[in-house]
Each structure stands twice: as C-alpha cells, then as structure tokens.
Amino acid sequence: MSMSTSTEVIAHHWAFAIFLIVAIGLCCLMLVGGWFLGGRARARHKNVPFESGIDSVGTARLRLSAKFYLVAMFFVIFDVEALYLFAWSTSIRESGWVGFVEAAIFIFVLLAGLVYLARIGALDWTPARSRRERMNPETNSIANRQR
C-alpha cells in the first residue's frame, strides 16, 4: 500500500474512526462510573431474586414446553414476511401487475404454510388426548358408554 493510498483511506474514514473511539470511550466511562458510584449490597439476601414482592419458591429451573419456542419461531417467521409485504406495498405502483402477482403468490405460500401448521397440530395447544377425541368422535362416544 503506497503512502497516497493510505492517506486517502484515512481521509475518507477519519470521522468513523473518531466516532468509534468516542463511543467505546463513553461506554467504558459509564461502566467505570457505575462501578465507582454504585451502591454495594452487603445484606445476607443480596443474591435472592426479588419478583413483585413475592418470595421465590422452588428452583428457577422450569421446563418449558417446546410449543413456546415453536410459537416464537412462527412469530418471527410471519413477522419477517409481514416486513416483506410492507416493503412491497410501498412500491406497488412501480412494480405493477407483475409485482402484484408475485405478492399474491407469496401470500398464497404463506397461507399454505399456515394451513399446514394447523393441520399437523403445531398451533394446537390442547393435549393429544382431546385432539384425538375431536378427530374421532366415535371413539369418544364408545369411551363414554363404557364408563
């Protein structure tokens, strides 16, 4: 790299370098200031979690159903797709009929995915037993007669 090239790079990027240095320095200043100025808790309940004035009971290791993670993933997927549709809607005049057909296909694929998720039971929060009873009402009536 010659001297003129490095000088050109510095000339183009000096503002970003100063911004980066100031931002990192400000973060360090706030962390150090909080460490020096922050209060110290010396009570015996220092590490006990406090939640809405209620003492915690049991362990914090709760097992969550995978349904919560599935719903979160579905939300993110459909949220990103809504962003695509919003971007398309802002440029609908420029895209014309071709863009409209492409968006219609995109929406159809979204609806097909939603129907598929509903059919496999990914959006169903009921237990498997009640789902079976709904799917096969004859089994439900036979089970009730045997009781």
From Swiss-Prot:
It is a multi-pass membrane protein. It is found in: Cell inner membrane. NDH-1 shuttles electrons from NADH, via FMN and iron-sulfur (Fe-S) centers, to quinones in the respiratory chain. The immediate electron acceptor for the enzyme in this species is believed to be ubiquinone. Couples the redox reaction to proton translocation (for every two electrons transferred, four hydrogen ions are translocated across the cytoplasmic membrane), and thus conserves the redox energy in a proton gradient. GO terms for cellular component: NADH dehydrogenase complex; plasma membrane. The keyword Heme does not apply. Its EC number is 7.1.1.-. It catalyses: a quinone + NADH + 5 H(+)(in) = a quinol + NAD(+) + 4 H(+)(out). This is NADH-quinone oxidoreductase subunit A. Keywords: Cell inner membrane, Cell membrane, Membrane, NAD, Quinone, Translocase, Transmembrane, Transmembrane helix, Transport, Ubiquinone. Pfam families: Oxidored_q4. One of its GO terms (molecular function) is NADH:ubiquinone reductase (non-electrogenic) activity. The chain crosses the membrane at residues 16-36, 68-88, 97-117.
